């Protein structure tokens, strides 16, 4: 937040300290902004893994340049993680003016805190331009705080602070109806499965497996269970099997 407050330019872009922009990143964005004057620009990046010769694309959601509606972007944030990152977006700086979001619950949080920063500027945006250009290099480290799983970090990985702020913004956006609650429930269910099986895979001892099973998963399940009959059809066969295994704490 201090960086945003100190910024002087017309547009803001973000860079994690251990990542890199592609050589043509800023020039490409300057040209796109000059030609289109968008409130936000979304672009793609590549994920570089240690010991791997290839690179996986991230943020590549469409094949061609196109304008997105703000409502579509909001629905994509309610539905999953695909567009979470600040660092695959450029923002008109004015979008951050007057941000009244309470970020106090996110102090020291390293899961979901990036996504929360998107909600206020998106509320202020009138238009969004997507370009398929790969402009960012994200260096994936399996032992990083974000990607590693540990039985002592279950609560952190479930991103409950992020979901709480997202729920407040859904109400603010007028997206608190049952259809949008179903999208959120499906997102929460998939987060639950990801964390449960990610942590289970990391358990090396009987004691760790016991901690996993004793965790109060029931409170997490209550978030999506009221919508399960409606969202069940959107789950893959694999997800349904995993859900049964998690429910039995296997």
What residue spans do the PLM features occupy?
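C-terminal, non-catalytic tails of nucleotide-sugar-dependent glycosyltransferases
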Residues: 159-183
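Short aromatic/hydrophobic "clamp" motif used to bind/position activated sugar donors
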Residues: 12
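Short, charged, amphipathic alpha-helical segments
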Residues: 179-186, 209, 213
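Amphipathic alpha-helical repeat scaffolds of TPR domains
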Residues: 185-194
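Membrane-interface aromatic/basic loop that binds lipid-linked glycans or pyrophosphate carriers
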Residues: 197-250
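Catalytic metal- and UDP-sugar-binding loop of GT-A-like glycosyltransferases, i.e.
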Residues: 15-17
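Donor-binding/catalytic cores of nucleotide-activated saccharide
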Residues: 20-129, 136-153
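Glycine-rich, basic loop-to-helix element that forms the pyrophosphate-binding segment
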Residues: 1-7
